[in-house]
Amino acid sequence: MKLLAATVLLLTVCSLEGALVRRQAEEPSVESLVSQYFQTVTDYGKDLMEKVKSPELQAQAKAYFEKSKEQLTPLVKKAGTDLVNFLSYFVELRTQPATQ
């Protein structure tokens, strides 16, 4: 019976000491987390700059912009024409009552 009580007491003390050690363990500070975050972002930025310098990526970007320009130019011209027509309609409405 004494052996059982001593075993339970020993296990309880060991588990409490383990919990105490875990609580006393040093948590990473906010400053170190922020510093680590900025270091990671900086590393990604450097990697990205190296990838952008490649001629293949530059050629792909140029082709994409040229294709976009070809597709958007007619739409912009049509939107400009529609806007001019819309505004001229209101100008005509405004001048008609004055002439009558």
Curated annotation (Swiss-Prot):
InterPro entries: ApoA-II, ApoA-II_sf. It comes from the Eukaryota. The modification Phosphoserine is found at S54, S68. SUPFAM superfamilies: Apolipoprotein A-II. Residues 1-18 form the signal peptide. May stabilize HDL (high density lipoprotein) structure by its association with lipids, and affect the HDL metabolism. Gene3D superfamilies: 6.10.250.100. It comes from Chlorocebus sabaeus. Monomer. Interacts with NAXE and NDRG1. This is Apolipoprotein A-II.
